[in-house]
């Protein structure tokens, strides 16, 4: 029996340090084409019109009209669309895909697409959200989840306290900075759609595909490729590019690869939540802390995602 203090090699150790590991961008099935995402350039607005150019032969667009069932990513609150329809709620929100055999041609097409917006004032901070009035997105309140916990007789400790020390701390967004960006390959054989990619939670993508396509498990396959870092950044978010490549593969009957550029990934993927933390510490005559009242407010961004789980 080995000692529990002895180091062991991970099963993927040799391939990763030698550079032999095959990641999603390294895979090129026969007949594969590429996809790029056209995203919102404004933080919040109504979409008034989308003008697309005449597409070269073999190139096509995928948007919300290609979703046969529900245009939603099922997480906790089911509030985030797969593609924006009438409104965008953050810079980088996906509106459509442009797909084809040459990346350079795809980028040229994207440059010619014109989107007309009607701006809406965005809410960009916790303080702004708290000062909002109806109509609210979730029920009759400016927040979508609220938890309270208490241990011991707090009120009695407050009465005994001789002084109170109050502190406020703020944390900002944190980017996971995984080496491999969000990347997916979708394939369709006429009956089953297969999505391979960089992810942490394959069954999140399975559920998203079931909701979007209206199919059962027998027609959906999701494979986690060797993942070049994630750190929480590839939990629920890969459902979006996962459904995107599936829709493109079904439409084209060809394998479709979607790999985010670094700037694109940082701009549009989920982050560690910014927070405001207020702590009131109650001290007795010996300056021992006998109670604490802690309030943590977390910025969930444009959509709820896994915010309630993180909090």
Can you say where each PLM-predicted feature lies in the sequence?
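Helix-loop-helix junctions that connect adjacent transmembrane helices in secondary transporters/permeases
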Residues: 68, 131-213
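Flexible, low-hydrophobicity surface segments
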Residues: 1-141, 251, 306
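Short coil/turn connectors at secondary-structure junctions
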Residues: 31-34, 57-59, 85, 92-95, ...
């Amino acid at each position: 029996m080995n000692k529990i203090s002895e180091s062991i090699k991970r099963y993927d150790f040799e391939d990763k340090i030698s550079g032999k590991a095959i990641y999603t961008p390294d895979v090129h099935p026969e007949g594969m084409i590429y996809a790029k995402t056209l995203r919102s350039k404004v933080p919040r607005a109504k979409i008034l019109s989308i003008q697309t150019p005449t597409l070269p032969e073999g190139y096509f667009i995928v948007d919300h009209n290609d979703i046969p069932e529900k245009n939603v990513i099922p997480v906790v609150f089911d509030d985030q669309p797969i593609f924006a329809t009438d409104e965008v709620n953050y810079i980088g929100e996906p509106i459509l895909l442009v797909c084809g055999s040459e990346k350079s041609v795809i980028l040229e097409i994207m440059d010619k697409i014109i989107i007309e917006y009607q701006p809406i004032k965005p809410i960009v901070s916790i303080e702004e959200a708290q000062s909002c009035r109806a109509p609210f997105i979730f029920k009759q309140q400016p927040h979508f989840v609220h938890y309270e916990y208490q241990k011991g007789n707090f009120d009695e400790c407050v009465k005994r306290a001789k002084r109170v020390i109050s502190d406020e701390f703020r944390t900002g967004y944190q980017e996971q900075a995984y080496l491999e960006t969000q990347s997916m390959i979708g394939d369709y054989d006429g009956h089953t759609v297969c999505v391979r990619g960089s992810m942490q939670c394959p069954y999140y993508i399975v559920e998203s595909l079931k909701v979007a396509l209206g199919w059962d498990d027998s027609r959906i396959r999701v494979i986690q490729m060797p993942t070049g870092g994630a750190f929480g950044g590839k939990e629920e978010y890969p459902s979006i590019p996962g459904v995107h490549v599936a829709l493109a593969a079904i439409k084209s009957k060809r394998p479709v690869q979607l790999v985010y550029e670094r700037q694109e990934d940082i701009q549009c993927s989920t982050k560690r939540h910014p927070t405001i933390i207020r702590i009131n510490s109650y001290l007795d005559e010996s300056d021992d802390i006998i109670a604490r009242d802690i309030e943590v407010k977390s910025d969930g961004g444009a959509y709820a995602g896994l915010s309630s789980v993180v909090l």
